[in-house]
């Protein structure tokens, strides 16, 4: 009888141990690392000024309108430390000469991808730095120039990128401050000779059109400073955007500056139907 009781007790202990091991294995396997995409869609309006001596020695000034999209996500590998960002924008500008008798139009498309290493020196404060790649294409159109009315531009760059964010509360309202900076370090860009027409390029004069870009002849800084004000599932983005670029090649000098007010919406999205408390969520911005 005692032997039977001991055997039963051993079987019960073995069953309990196997059950606990199975529960732990299922729990460990069921925990997934989720990396939400922080998406921002914004409308920008502000002031712009342009100097392009290929078209005119005069500086034109006017307004700019830009539609911008931004997507940030933690990387699959080392997701606590590495984040990636993709940005795309389309812009249109209308500017007048100092005498206000000539109008200049500027159309641009920008695409960029970057990866940054981040850390949190203090609670609620995140900083990150890294690099990426950027593509810019666009054109200036000056109707009064009958011979050379268009100045095209195109560049591919390796960029240096930085991000900083700080989360706080204003009363009961959660607010996240964010600053993003991007600068090309080295790249390649297009520029014709001074006075060279695009008809000459069309006829086959392709020499000297591509140039190696660095800070001495192809400088640009793009800085976004914004506040994301939480409204529940989405946040209202209000901010300021500075975009400054300059260049000098073939005796052609270019200067372009925009100062824009930013209004948009930001939200975090996951490609799942539901959340579980055991799931590990790693956002791109803390």
Task: Please tell me what each predicted stretch does.
Residues 67-75, 109-117, 131-135, 160-166, ...:
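Residues on the lipid-exposed face of transmembrane beta-strands in outer-membrane beta-barrel proteins
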Residues 59-67, 103-111, 125, 150-160, ...:
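Residues that define the transmembrane beta-barrel architecture of outer-membrane proteins
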Residues 51-59, 70, 95-103, 145-151, ...:
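Extracellular loop and loop/strand-boundary signature of outer-membrane beta-barrel proteins
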Residues 147-233:
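Outer-membrane beta-barrel transmembrane domain signature
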